[in-house]
């Protein structure tokens, strides 16, 4: 996933 997609999951 692109950076900042989720503050908890960035995979």
UniProtKB/Swiss-Prot annotation:
Tissue specificity remark: Expressed by the skin glands.
GO cellular component terms, semicolon-separated? extracellular region
Q: What is its main location?
A: secreted
Does the UniProt entry include the keyword NAD?
A: no
Q: Name one GO molecular function term.
A: toxin activity
Q: Does the keyword Cell cycle apply?
A: no
What keywords appear on the UniProt entry? Amphibian defense peptide, G-protein coupled receptor impairing toxin, Secreted, Toxin, Vasoactive, Vasodilator
Instruction: Tell me where in or outside the cell this protein is found.
Output: Secreted
One of the GO BP terms on file:
defense response
State the protein's purpose: Induces relaxation of mouse trachea that has been precontracted with methacholine. May induce relaxation of arterial smooth muscle. May target bradykinin receptors (BDKRB).
Return the similarity comment: Belongs to the bradykinin-related peptide family.
The name this protein carries in UniProt is Bradykinin-like peptide RD-11
